[in-house]
Amino acid sequence: MDIAIQHPWFKRALGPFYPSRLFDQFFGEGLFEYDLLPFLSSTISPYYRQPVFRSVLDSGISEVRSDRDKFVIFLDVKHFSPEDLTVKVLEDFVEIHGKHNERQDDHGYISREFHRRYRLPSNVDQSALSCSLSADGMLTFSGPKVPSGVDAGHSERAIPVSREEKPSSAPSS
């Protein structure tokens, strides 16, 4: 049996009645209304595609803030527990690694892993770095800055992740 592969810019005549393409899905994330009824947008206009910005913004984008007094990283890690996260400082970098083995959810089995690496400003006091995970899954890594000319200290060490019972005060995307 031959299966015709079709370029995504073209639709079949019965396109609204075919399910969306497999690679358009965000695995491990929740479904939105337009995911359940994709034919509605196609009946309005055959060339209209639902925007995926909402899904992309909710998929774990980080925010880095560096002002005069402190350096802060906010990272959405809602699918990970503190035991699944490892935060290390290696010279001028902070490495955040999250991994959980295969576990069952509503749709079957899933495993996740990510690795992020950020450069620390040279004037961040590495002896006073802290990391916490809020109740809503926002990881906050922060450290105060020292005045220029003072040694900020550079070493390799692990930063423990503490759990907070309140939601994060980080801005939502």
UniProtKB/Swiss-Prot annotation:
Residues recorded with modification Phosphoserine: S45, S122
UniProt signal peptide: none
InterPro entries cross-referenced by the UniProt entry: A-crystallin/Hsp20_dom, Alpha-crystallin/HSP_16, Alpha-crystallin/sHSP_animal, Alpha-crystallin_N, HSP20-like_chaperone
Amino-acid positions noted as binding Zn(2+) 1 in the UniProt annotation, renumbered to this chain: H100, E102
Region (Disordered): 144-173
Positions carrying Deamidated asparagine: N101, N123
Biased composition (Basic and acidic residues): 153-167
Entry binding sites for Zn(2+) 2: H107
CDD domains given in the database record: ACD_alphaA-crystallin_HspB4
GO cellular component: cytoplasm; nucleus
Residues carrying N6-acetyllysine: K70, K99
Description of post-translational modifications: Acetylation at Lys-70 may increase chaperone activity.
Region of interest called Required for complex formation with BFSP1 and BFSP2, as start-end residue ranges on this chain: 1-63
Binding site for Zn(2+) 3: H154
Residues where N-acetylmethionine is found: M1
Keyword Iron-sulfur tagged: no
PANTHER family recorded: ALPHA-CRYSTALLIN A CHAIN, HEAT SHOCK PROTEIN HSP-12.2-RELATED
Functional note: Contributes to the transparency and refractive index of the lens. Acts as a chaperone, preventing aggregation of various proteins under a wide range of stress conditions. Required for the correct formation of lens intermediate filaments as part of a complex composed of BFSP1, BFSP2 and CRYAA.
Quaternary organization: Heteromer composed of three CRYAA and one CRYAB subunits. Inter-subunit bridging via zinc ions enhances stability, which is crucial as there is no protein turn over in the lens. Can also form homodimers and homotetramers (dimers of dimers) which serve as the building blocks of homooligomers. Within homooligomers, the zinc-binding motif is created from residues of 3 different molecules. His-100 and Glu-102 from one molecule are ligands of the zinc ion, and His-107 and His-154 residues from additional molecules complete the site with tetrahedral coordination geometry.
Protein name, entry field: Alpha-crystallin A chain
Organism: Zalophus californianus (California sealion)
Gene this chain is encoded by: CRYAA
